[in-house]
Swiss-Prot record:
Miscellaneous comment as given in the Swiss-Prot or TrEMBL entry: The basic functional RuBisCO is composed of a large chain homodimer in a 'head-to-tail' conformation. In form I RuBisCO this homodimer is arranged in a barrel-like tetramer with the small subunits forming a tetrameric 'cap' on each end of the 'barrel'.
Cellular component annotations (GO), alphabetically ordered: chloroplast
Protein name, as recorded: Ribulose bisphosphate carboxylase large chain
The keyword Plastid appears for this protein: yes
Length: 455
């Protein structure tokens, strides 16, 4: 007789283990599972655990050469989703040995790899991940983190202000640098390359880097404040990306930028290591995130992408506005904003946080609020995001009727007014509009901005 029982397997026999005690070293995942009609929850949950770890669809001879018990993923808990009939949350525990140290790429290849195309499931969404301390410690994380960034920039006690240079495509390098200078001169801390500005025929990267560096040094000299421009180093190859980062370092600028999802985690981690070694801050843009996180029942929630970025490395990351033109529910957004900034985050399902996460002193990331925001939003943004954030007004700066510099002045005056009001104990949520109106009496630039964008 054959030494093992051949044939197609019932996953739940091996991979559904409701009495399993999770280990401190396990990576834990919460999946929202929508099985095909007729597939029981236990089988679907077990299938997810199997397909994203050691399983294959049939019993194989080589299973006998290893210890499945040591290496298999386990579905250890299943709970129904309130208000959804055929949907539930499956909790899966993965032994740490399944993952390469310091590789977000490998972690995702396993956990969100082939399993998302699995036939027995109608849809699958990864809602949250618990990264164990032992695995966190294998990552460098953000190049510098929030405190070091404040020290480098000498800016304390308030959110930082940025602006994306528009029109995003079509300006020459010289005119682009001119727009950068105007914004920084007016009072912003940062300006930003748009995520799709890489190195195109109308503006090659080296020319842009040069003119932007000139603009920020001129603005720095005139304002006495440290200025930055996020130079987008994203490129078609890792070598080209590093070449751009090297040139930024040679120019002596404080910060570069990367599109971490389109560029990929391998490239991102490479750049993050370079940035720490060379004293550059790293701004991260999340272009492509909505492809992955927009669907409610398939894909990955952004909080998982945010956690992955903190491991891979970045000092700023775009994370929605709660107000403005891009969607984002307040509690949920604040949940992953805290995951980015804090050292320790408690499990709290009302904020979408399925697991308690301890970052064991990995530096924090500044959340960036960007997209359709303007001066009237300033009180709400200051209240929601607090000091440790970057508020980015693209059109909200460049759309000012008098030009970029006055637009920058309006934003800076509005921000300083909100911070001062908050420090005096006023309630930004209820008195916000009044605070902006009072400030606009002393600032014609702000008054003009208040006219253009109605409260």
């Amino acid at each position: 007789s054959v030494g093992f029982k051949a044939g197609v397997k019932d996953y739940k026999l091996t991979y559904y283990t409701p009495d399993y005690e999770t280990k401190d070293t396990d990576i834990l995942a919460a999946f929202r599972v929508t099985p095909q009609p007729g597939v029981p929850p236990e089988e679907a949950g077990a299938a997810v655990a199997a397909e994203s770890s050691t399983g294959t669809w049939t019993t194989v001879w080589t299973d006998g050469l290893t210890s499945l018990d040591r290496y298999k993923g386990r579905c250890y808990h299943i709970e129904p989703v309130a208000g959804e009939e055929s949907q539930f949350i499956a909790y899966v525990a993965y032994p740490l040995d399944l993952f390469e140290e310091g590789s977000v790429t490998n972690m995702f290849t396993s956990i969100v790899g082939n399993v998302f195309g699995f036939k027995a499931l109608r849809a699958l969404r990864l809602e949250d991940l618990r990264i164990p301390n032992a695995y966190v410690k294998t990552f460098q994380g953000p190049p510098h983190g929030i405190q070091v960034e404040r020290d480098k920039l000498n800016k304390y006690g308030r959110p930082l202000l940025g602006c994306t240079i528009k029109p995003k495509l079509g300006l020459s390098a010289k005119n682009y640098g001119r727009a950068v200078y105007e914004c920084l001169r007016g009072g912003l801390d940062f300006t930003k390359d748009d995520e799709n500005v890489n190195s195109q025929p109308f503006m090659r990267w080296r020319d842009r880097f040069l003119f932007c560096a000139e603009a920020l040094y001129k603005a720095q000299a005139e304002t006495g404040e440290i200025k930055g421009h996020y130079l987008n180093a994203t490129a078609g190859t890792c070598e080209e990306m590093i070449k751009r980062a090297v040139f930024a370092r040679e120019l002596g600028v404080p910060i570069v930028m990367h599109d971490y999802l389109t560029g990929g985690f391998t490239a991102n981690t490479t750049l993050a290591h370079y940035c720490r070694d060379n004293g550059l801050l790293l701004h991260i843009h999340r272009a492509m995130h909505a492809v992955i996180d927009r669907q409610k029942n398939h894909g990955m929630h952004f909080r998982v992408l945010a956690k992955a970025l903190r491991l891979s490395g970045g000092d700023h990351i775009h994370s929605g506005t709660v107000v403005g033109k891009l969607e984002g529910e307040r509690e949920i957004t604040l949940g992953f904003v805290d995951l980015l900034r804090d050292d320790f985050v408690e499990k709290d399902r009302s904020r979408g946080i399925y697991f308690t996460q301890d970052w064991v002193s990995l530096p924090g990331v500044l959340p960036v609020a960007s997209g359709g925001i303007h001066v009237w939003h300033m009180p709400a943004l200051t209240e929601i995001f607090g000091d440790d954030s970057v508020l980015q007004f693209g059109g909200g700066t460049l759309g000012h009727p008098w030009g970029n510099a006055p637009g920058a002045v309006a934003n800076r005056v509005a921000l300083e007014a909100c911070v001062q009001a908050r420090n005096e104990g006023r309630d930004l949520a209820s008195e916000g509009n009044q605070i902006i109106r009072e400030a606009s009496k002393w600032s014609p630039e702000l008054a003009a901005a208040c006219e253009v964008w109605k409260e």
